[in-house]
């Protein structure tokens, strides 16, 4: 249903290999469960390399896709995403916000609480910092 390839947005991306219907669960965001405190240390290392791989699950728990992650960590940010996040039973699911065409890159809004250290490249002219 999906595959990792080069992306125009940022490095690698995830693409649909077949049409994906609206609201379909596509993949879960996998990684090591760590404390919020530990994630602050790791995020600094990742951000220096231009990556955002820590996903806040709760106020105390973060999923670090840099350790034990799957291809979901390569789904890029977009200010106009075609996917959304759905957290069920402590599992972070990426779901289709609309029907996604074959060959289309999957994106979701990272909606970060960060310091705006990474320039958004979701489309030409986007000036947002994530």
For the regions a language model picked out, list residue spans one by one:
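Conserved catalytic SET/PR domain of SAM-dependent protein methyltransferases, capturing the structural core
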Residues: 1-130
């Amino acid at each position: 249903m999906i595959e990792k390839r080069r992306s125009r947005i940022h490095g690698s991306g995830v693409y649909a290999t077949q049409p994906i219907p609206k609201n379909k669960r596509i993949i879960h965001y996998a990684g090591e469960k760590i404390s919020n405190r530990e994630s602050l240390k790791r995020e600094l290392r990742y951000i220096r390399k231009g990556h955002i791989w820590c996903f806040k699950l709760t106020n105390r728990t973060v999923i670090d896709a840099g350790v034990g992650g799957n291809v979901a960590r390569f789904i890029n940010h977009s200010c106009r995403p075609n996917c959304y996040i759905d957290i069920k039973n402590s599992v972070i699911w990426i779901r289709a916000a609309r029907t996604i065409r074959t060959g289309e890159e999957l994106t979701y809004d990272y909606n970060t609480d960060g310091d705006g250290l990474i320039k958004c490249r979701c489309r030409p002219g986007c000036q947002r910092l994530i």
